[in-house]
Amino acid sequence: FLAEENIIPDSYKETNQRYMDAYLNGTLQMEDWGKFSLVFYDGKTAEDIKETMERFFKEVFEPMINIFALKKIHHHYENNDYLLLATATNEIIAKFAAARLGFDDYVATKIVKKDQTIYTNQIEFPPAFKEGKLTMVRQWIEDQKWVGKESFFYSDSVNDLPLLDYVSHPIAT
């Protein structure tokens, strides 16, 4: 999307595909991925990127939403379940995605900020990836006093095995 909008060079597509292949294979190095994938945000505020993010979600994200996923989300919503999005994706995209899908909260890879408002191309550790995602979800559970409650987690990634092993109802899609 960013390359098509001439926001980043076309050459990023090939590099992005290599990172996606590494993610799918379980070999992604998140620090390197962060430096690459966050280049668009570097030096910008949330207000600076708002319009681009809204277009991305309307033109790219929403058409990609799987009807199976929407049905599952709706099922949990109808059961008055609390919906927490846990994703390795950066916090900016996760915030938009959680809002668009009707989630109550989200856990995502955090971006280092300058002066608390200006994004960089660096991620905070731990990222919400592999064991780091489990660590962040456990922290969220503790902070929200959610301990001992039934939990479901849906994933299509080998990178989520730690969290799938942790929840009461793991669902590999």
Residue ranges of model-derived segments:
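A metal-dependent, Asp-based hydrolase signature
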Residues: A3-H75
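C-terminal cap/substrate-recognition subdomain and adjoining C-terminal extension
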Residues: E51-E54, K58-T173
